[in-house]
């Protein structure tokens, strides 16, 4: 800029209350670019904007961020208040409270800020430029050009000094503002409505390598930052972050030309419960806000007194015309200051009255079923996200099955105040107390789920029952498509039947683009034209917005008392309970971490030729869907032909696979496990049976001498007693009758024994003692199945040989009507056929 402007001329400009160094340090309150952009988004939200457009522009090799909204806009006085650090005239229900977001957010992203706003037919521009201050050597103060003009471009000026200031401001903006190749008038034309605001940030922040701090090339419809947390997309993607930033998204947000589709935080939650918490003990935020409001009233009083002192007792008839114009301007300032004072007093009094009322809030809890690793506690203050997925509560570190369990809180600013960057809480002690209350509620909630809700839900919704020893969490996650209970990387399997149940349980939530209300449908076909960009209430009820009741709160109260649903007992009593079988098998066999279940593989259909007496025609196929687990010895194929046929024809066969739900949950049903482990054979082998000792009532012990005992018995018993006493070891005292009990066996020992029988039956070596072994049960069963198939094939070969023999006889009889064959009167059919075949071959020779 040519040095044709004196330093004194800059005194005509508006001046901020801080210096340039504070402006730089204040920008570091944000943890990253997404946090800074969110601050600017909050300003549009608080201005009741319906639409916000966030764009990245590259004009003449200059990069800019542009945010354009159709909110209330600002007059010149309101725009100047924006550069007063720490000032905020927003109501208590608004998101922004510190009056600092515009400056801190903008200068975290870049070094040049241009604001253009429109209200009441007046356009106002405001520029804060680092480059301008550095070029002019202005480091002690922040000078802010802030010209105003009407829709025709005519400046709003009352005096000659105001005109001079306007010209100077336009000159500085023309040189230092981040306009690119555009003019200020062209930029103002982009505000098409009667009100609105445009924020342009230039000279964007770069890394030490010269690259932009934001990535705009990875996704043309998004703004990406490198946070180093790939498993948390809301830390890297502006679009993902904005999907959850507001509980009630009243404003449409467009990022680089494409609308952000908000997500309802609990749309995929089940078991939605809430607990009411009193806020009486949280007073730090209230006291701080009250002090701020008292300070605002005091400043307004001082401002009014200052203006009144400038007016004094001047007589309008004794001054010049220009002085009278200045006096008129002062009178307007008095009116404005009085309005500000009245507004501040009314706001403070309303806040006091509201503070006397009882404060409470809800802890909303549920189980996330679609993205269960994206759980934790989500804190919102005044409808705005503060912390997402917080896991400071001990519940998440001490409770193994905490994955998927989530909670969100919608807090009021009068109880809790956010930090300046809205990435945490302002009062640490209050936050710690709040976390402890959340921890207690989550502990009660998980107990309720495990003891009551999950068993009832599985029975009523999925027709799945819980048996003694079953891991209810494993069964629950199994039916919802997760084969691992605690892994955060486990991916949910897709199932259309499960989707149908989810639609009924959770509903399908859509945000109306007209009234911005969440609408719930239970089936996809209830929604006509399901394009989210244009969805409105009319797509559901065909009558217009708000004609149906939206279920904004579908959480019920967490019961303090509830019925404990006891697990059912298993039908089998021949062995210890096989619940927790998966974990027990792992410990007994020291298997690898693959955690494969002992499932019987499903055997594919094979071709089988039955004899005429078997009820099947020659060449007819049959399907084998199950197979006995014990292999048929290779050296006894012929002796087992009838047995194999009997086993295939009867229903006494092992189920081809463990129940799908139990397989996903990580446990096998007791009946299936018993069949796999115990029912090795119907006739050839005896299953190992260990019966629990019968409980007997204790009897008083009689001390009977050996002689008397012999006298009380007959001769036969005497001989038996003599033989028994002759062989039994001598004891000093006999206190009671010895009871022969079955040897006790722990669950691990029993499972190991069953597993060894399983391996031995399939021709495998048993588990080594005090050793480890890795094996694949599915592969073992498949090998046995292949051997059984070979045995079946031998049957088929024998039948085919018989058919060939019969064919030879029939062919010969057809060619020779008369024959002199000697057909044996006795013998099997096979022997008779062989005899006739030998006779035929002898005649041929």
UniProtKB/Swiss-Prot annotation:
* Low complexity composition-biased segments: 574-590
Q: In which tissues is it expressed?
A: Expressed in germline and somatic cells.
Q: Where does Mg(2+) bind?
A: 43
Name the major location: nucleus
- Annotated GO MF terms: ATP binding; ATP hydrolysis activity; ATP-dependent topological DNA co-entrapment activity; DNA binding; metal ion binding
Ranges where the record places region Disordered: 566-590, 628-739
- List GO terms (cellular component aspect): nuclear body; nucleus
What stretch or stretches form a coiled coil here? 284-311
Gene inactivation effect: Mortal germline (Mrt) phenotype in which there is a progressive decline in fertility with each generation at 25 degrees Celsius culminating in complete sterility after five to six generations. Resistant to nuclear RNAi and defective RNAi inheritance. Reduced trimethylation of 'Lys-9' of histone H3 at endogenous siRNA-directed targets, a small degree of irregularly localized heterochromatin, with 70% correctly localized, defective chromatin compaction in hermaphrodite X chromosomes.
Single GO BP term:
regulatory ncRNA-mediated gene silencing
Q: What does this protein do?
A: Binds non-specifically to DNA and forms static foci which grow by recruiting other morc-1 molecules, and thereby stimulates conformational changes and compaction of DNA, which appears to be enhanced by ATP-binding, but does not require ATP activity. Preferentially binds to long DNAs. Compacts and entraps segments of DNA by sequentially forming loops along the DNA, beginning at the free ends of single- and double-tethered DNA. Does not extrude the DNA loops on compacted double-tethered DNA. Involved in gene silencing.
Per its record, how is this protein called by name? ATPase morc-1
Q: Which organism is it from?
A: Caenorhabditis elegans
């Amino acid at each position: 800029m040519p040095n044709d402007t004196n330093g004194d001329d800059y005194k005509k400009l508006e001046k901020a209350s801080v210096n340039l160094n504070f402006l730089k340090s204040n920008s570091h309150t944000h943890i990253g670019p997404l946090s800074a952009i969110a601050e600017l988004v909050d300003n549009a939200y608080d201005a009741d904007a319906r639409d916000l457009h966030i764009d990245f522009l590259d004009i003449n090799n200059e990069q800019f961020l542009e945010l354009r909204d159709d909110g209330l806009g600002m007059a010149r006085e309101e725009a100047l208040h924006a550069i007063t650090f720490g000032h905020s005239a927003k109501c208590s229900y608004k998101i922004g409270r510190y009056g600092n977001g515009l400056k801190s957010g903008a200068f975290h992203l870049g070094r040049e800020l241009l604001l253009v706003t429109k209200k009441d037919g007046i356009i106002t521009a405001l520029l804060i430029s680092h480059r301008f201050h550095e070029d002019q050597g202005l480091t002690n103060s922040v000078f802010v050009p802030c010209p105003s003009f009407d829709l025709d471009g005519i400046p709003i000026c009352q005096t000659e000094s105001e005109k001079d200031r306007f010209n100077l401001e336009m000159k500085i903006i023309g040189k230092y503002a981040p306009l690119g190749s555009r003019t200020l008038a062209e930029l103002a034309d982009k505000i098409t409505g009667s009100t609105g605001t445009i924020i342009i940030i230039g000279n964007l922040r770069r890394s030490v390598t010269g690259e932009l701090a934001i990535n705009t090339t990875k996704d043309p419809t998004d703004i990406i930052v490198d946070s180093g947390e790939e498993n948390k997309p809301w830390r890297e993607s502006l679009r993902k972050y904005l999907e959850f930033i507001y509980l009630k998204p009243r404003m449409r947000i467009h990022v680089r030309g494409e609308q952000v589709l908000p997500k309802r935080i609990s749309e995929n939650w089940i078991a939605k419960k809430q607990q009411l918490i009193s806020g009486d003990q949280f007073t730090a935020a209230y006291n701080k806000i009250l002090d701020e409001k008292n300070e605002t009233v005091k400043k307004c009083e001082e401002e009014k007194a200052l203006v009144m002192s400038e007016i004094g007792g001047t007589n309008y008839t004794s001054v010049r015309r220009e002085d009278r114009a200045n006096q008129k301007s002062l009178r307007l300032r008095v009116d404005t200051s009085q309005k500000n004072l009245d507004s501040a007093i009314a706001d403070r009094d309303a806040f006091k009255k509201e503070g006397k009322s009882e404060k409470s809030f809800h802890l909303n809890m549920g189980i996330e079923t679609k993205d269960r690793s994206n759980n934790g506690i989500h804190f919102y203050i005044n409808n705005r996200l503060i912390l997402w997925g917080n896991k400071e509560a001990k519940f998440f570190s001490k409770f193994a099955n905490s994955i998927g369990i989530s909670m969100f809180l919608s807090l009021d600013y009068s109880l809790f105040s956010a930090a300046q960057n809205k990435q945490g809480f302002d009062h640490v002690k209050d936050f710690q107390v709040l976390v402890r209350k959340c921890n207690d509620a989550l502990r009660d909630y998980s107990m309720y789920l495990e003891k009551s809700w999950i068993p009832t839900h599985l029975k009523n919704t999925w027709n799945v029952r819980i048996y003694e020893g079953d891991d209810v969490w494993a069964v629950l996650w199994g039916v919802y498509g997760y084969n691992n209970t605690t892994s955060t990387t486990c991916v949910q399997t897709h199932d259309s039947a499960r989707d149908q149940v989810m639609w009924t349980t959770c509903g399908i939530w859509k945000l109306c683009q007209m009234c911005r209300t969440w609408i719930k449908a239970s089936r996809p076909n209830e929604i006509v034209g399901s394009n989210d960009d244009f969805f409105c209430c009319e797509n559901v009820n065909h009558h217009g917005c708000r004609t149906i009741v939206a279920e904004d709160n579908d959480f019920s109260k967490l019961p303090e008392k509830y019925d404990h649903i006891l697990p059912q007992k298993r039908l089998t009593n021949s062995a210890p309970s096989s619940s927790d079988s998966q974990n027990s098998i792992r410990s007994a066999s020291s298997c690898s971490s693959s955690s494969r279940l002992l499932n019987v593989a499903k055997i594919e259909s094979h071709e089988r030729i039955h004899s005429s007496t078997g009820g099947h025609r020659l060449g007819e196929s049959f399907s084998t869907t199950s197979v006995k687990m014990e292999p048929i010895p290779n050296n006894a194929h012929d002796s087992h032909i009838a047995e194999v046929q009997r086993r295939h024809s009867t229903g006494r066969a092992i189920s081809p696979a463990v129940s799908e739900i139990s397989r996903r949950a990580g446990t096998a049903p007791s009946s299936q496990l018993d069949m796999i482990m115990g029912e090795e054979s119907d006739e050839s082998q005896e299953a190992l049976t260990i019966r629990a000792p019968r409980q007997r009532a204790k009897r008083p012990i009689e001390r009977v001498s050996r002689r008397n005992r012999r006298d009380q018995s007959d001769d036969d018993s005497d001989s038996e007693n003599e033989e028994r006493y002759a062989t039994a070891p001598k004891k000093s005292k006999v206190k009671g009758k010895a009871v022969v009990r079955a040897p006790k066996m722990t669950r691990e020992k029993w499972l190991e024994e069953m597993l060894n029988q399983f391996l031995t039956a399939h021709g495998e070596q048993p588990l080594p003692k005090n050793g480890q072994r890795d094996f694949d049960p599915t592969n073992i069963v498949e090998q046995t199945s292949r051997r059984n198939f070979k045995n079946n094939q031998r049957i088929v070969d024998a039948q085919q040989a018989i058919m060939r023999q019969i064919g030879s006889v029939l062919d010969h009889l057809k060619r020779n009507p008369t024959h002199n064959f000697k057909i044996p009167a006795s013998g099997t059919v096979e022997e008779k056929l062989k005899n006739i075949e030998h006779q035929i071959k002898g005649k041929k020779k």
